[in-house]
Amino acid sequence: KGSYDIYVQNGMIEIYSIRDKNGNPHVTFEVRNGKMHQCKGKQNKMPKFKYIPAIQKVIQQQKWEIIEDVENTFHFKKNGKLYNLLDFPKNKVFTFKGDIDLSHSNLTKLPDLSNVVMLFGSFNCSGNQLSSLEGSPQRILGDFNCSHNVLDTLKGAPLKVDGYFDCSYNNLTVLEEKPQTIRNNFNYTHNPIALIQTIQNQKNRQT
C-alpha cells in the first residue's frame, strides 16, 4: 500500500471518482498515463447501471484508453475493437464476460441486450419498475434475478439460465414465457400465481 501511495503522490497513478451530492464515492477510476486500468463500484464490484452514462461520459471527455475493467464501463472488446454495450450494432451478436447489475436503477424497461447470446456471469435487474423482460440476454451462465418489479409476464426472459431464476415479488398470474431451461432453483413466490396454485392445491385435497 505504501508504494502505491507514493505512485499516487508522484502523479504516476491518478485516482478519480464519481460522487453523489453528499460527497460519497460510487465509482473509482485508476488512470496511468491516460490509460484507464481500473473502474470499480462499491466493494470493488461492477458499478451500478445508473452510473454507466456518467462513467462513459467521463472516459470520453478525458479521452482515456480503456485497458482493464472493460466490462465495468459497459464496453467490450471483440476482434481487437472496443464496442459500447449500449450502442452496439443490432445485426451482430456477441458474448459478454462478467456480471451485469441493473438493480435499483429506476428502470421501466431494460436496455436492449438481446443480442448478447451468452452472458458469462449473472444478471440482476431486481428492484426496478419493469413490466417486461424484453431486452434480456439470450443465455445466462450464472443467475437471473428480476424480483421486486411489476412484471405480469415473463416474456423476453432468457431462453436458458444455468443458475437460479428469481422472479418473486411481481404481479405474475401465469408462468408462460419462462426460460426453457433453468438448471437451479425457480423462485416465483409472492406472486398471484403462487396464491392461485395454493388455493387450487387446497381444493384438490378437499375433493
Language model feature labels by segment:
Residues L82-C125, I140-L141, C146:
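LRR N-terminal entry segment and analogous cap-like coil->beta motifs
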